[in-house]
């Protein structure tokens, strides 16, 4: 049943967002008859509603295509569609490790973008053969020759043989299939008779079948009825089904060397299936594990709280379900005096945060408040120990801290020349250090080192608005560096509000504090007593706004008469207000939290 190795091609498609990866995948499926016309829809592989609406791919998907080449031979092509967005670079790295070749899709009207570079370099690091595909050549603005030259200059791959296609209209799709067969290599030698060795590429949860595991067989044969063992976790399972995606699930009897397929094995927890783990047969194990991947580290943390405290258990259950599908999302319980019970969650980046929040709200009908996103700081304590700080509210006493280190990123920004000045100004405002500036035709490529803390809030939105949407941005974490950071607390009526505390750079503290106090002044309703709103760093107040009191006209009932009568009533009111101020609680509406946290860095 297994296909001979030299007739298998495992490949992935890498490209910048919106350059047409998923549409090309649709055409390849259509042309090879993976789905009939009735089942075809746009972006077949984007299975989540959010993926379709935003037009982005989040989870990597796989398809097995059968193709009869022009030389009369039958080939099996395994395609892995990868996400293009920087937050999901982890999904990309894992998909690339399961393949031997890549199609590099570049939009013929836009040329090379920042994420094109990041993903191509990952493919080259995995020793991939690369076939260049120029998409959207039917557009009037397409300039294939200029883009070819740009690919050669920027990436350094020979683009003379590039395949010209239009994934939307279907021009040139057959040429792509031929190029895959002729230019991409077959899987490296695999031995059918050796002990089973397979790489776990991905896993997700299905409510009927339990956990479905995507595997790439390297040696040996995987079939129904075997007992497999995960070498990393040591867990053992009997295999119930083996199969492939065409993109429908189709069961097969066995998976041989070089093939990509799925297995189900009554696994209840996705946590038991570590991505990059080696799967082997329990009876006859292989002695050497695969090198695997490094697990995804959360980069951005924020608190998620239900607007209605009664939804807490529902939120816990919903997060557990999302965790089954997304191993890079982590959470733990936390309580806040202002917001009640909730969770501290870790994400790969801001888009990841937004998507998880949106999925919780849509798929589970929850109303949520998110606190300001923060990054992981390292605290070097006076006693020589090192701590990680995920939540600014938990910061220990400043006296005990020797130094605070913050994560920095290496960012690559590609932009048309016209917006270069404004973008450099933005990077400098965010404490960026310029590393490099090169020109590729009319576009500039700038490399900056930036503190992640400054990027987390709204850097991406600002970049897009400054450049009218033309600039593209990609980053990877570089290292931790010492920074002059201080904890800013917000006091409302002289009570600290833990959900609004944040770590900021000393130079920006006053500006941020003032802006936040002004915002809260607009959002908190007036009470019967005066409310001060203060931003404090340690014991020093750096900004203050006051919400004036509402007052009842107590003297309205006095018609004329002695002035002492009026004075007595006013004094009595003053006493009451004083007492009220001492014991009164200021109610901060939920809306105020949401707005204040959205403020970011305006």
From Swiss-Prot:
Its EC number is 3.6.5.n1. Keywords: Cell inner membrane, Cell membrane, GTP-binding, Hydrolase, Membrane, Nucleotide-binding, Protein biosynthesis. Transmembrane segments: none annotated. GTP binds at residues 18-23, 135-138. One of its GO terms (biological process) is positive regulation of translation. CDD domains: EF4_II (cd03699), EF4_III (cd16260), LepA (cd01890), lepA_C (cd03709). Residues 6-188 form the tr-type G domain. It is a peripheral membrane protein. It catalyses: GTP + H2O = GDP + phosphate + H(+). It is found in: Cell inner membrane. GO terms for cellular component: plasma membrane. The keyword GTP-binding applies. NCBIfam families: lepA, small_GTP. Required for accurate and efficient protein synthesis under certain stress conditions. May act as a fidelity factor of the translation reaction, by catalyzing a one-codon backward translocation of tRNAs on improperly translocated ribosomes. Back-translocation proceeds from a post-translocation (POST) complex to a pre-translocation (PRE) complex, thus giving elongation factor G a second chance to translocate the tRNAs correctly. Binds to ribosomes in a GTP-dependent manner. Belongs to the TRAFAC class translation factor GTPase superfamily. Classic translation factor GTPase family. LepA subfamily. This is Elongation factor 4. It comes from Brucella anthropi (strain ATCC 49188 / DSM 6882 / CCUG 24695 / JCM 21032 / LMG 3331 / NBRC 15819 / NCTC 12168 / Alc 37). The gene is lepA.
